[in-house]
Amino acid sequence: MATETGDSRIEKLAAFLTGQPTPVQHVTRSSPDYAEIRSGYLNNPSLDPPLIVRPQSAEEVALIASFMIEHGIEFTVRVGGHDLFGRSFRSDAVTLDLRKLNQVQIDRQGLTARVGGGTLCSNLARALGEHGMVAPCPTVPSVGYIGWAMHGGYGPYMGHFGLGVDQILAAKVVNHQGKVVEADADLLKGIRGAGAAFGIIVEVTIPVFPLEKVSLEN
């Protein structure tokens, strides 16, 4: 029996995405908007993934992840793309671009927000500002919020509200089986500091705080 090559697996994945009742958005190296979608904070032209997939929901992430796991397709996950070693991209792996999972749902009464896995810090700050709220964020607006938070989360508000990692109250994760799960206590403990090792985080719940006064002192 012939062994599948990496190229044939990528082609099979592209056909799978196109064949869904609602086709899953994706681009290849030959797509006219590939360079724009591939562009990021660290632009290394030698890191050009053969396929960039752009899911729009946690369910689509699970669908794609299940297929790639089943067929042995290696992939990376990209949001802000600020990894200093460029690990958001590999030339021999699919990139799962989560930036369309950018919803921010604010509960003013409960003082929490549900933040999509692809939310950039600029999107979060804007959404919170519209409601007179604030949460710890980094100083660079194009950083992906969850990647920043789960690996420490240092920023200008940490002296008042704590580190970004302290803000993760709950999380929704696509696990190694390609299933969407709510993080239990053990998984939450792992996510707070090493989240990328435990699955694809598609949503977190964080506390938010009324923005009452802004000054140089606070």
Q: Model segments located where?
A:
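N-terminal accessory segments
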Residues: 1-160, 217-218
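A generic structural signal for short, non-catalytic loop/turn and secondary-structure boundary residues
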Residues: 19-21, 89, 143, 166, ...
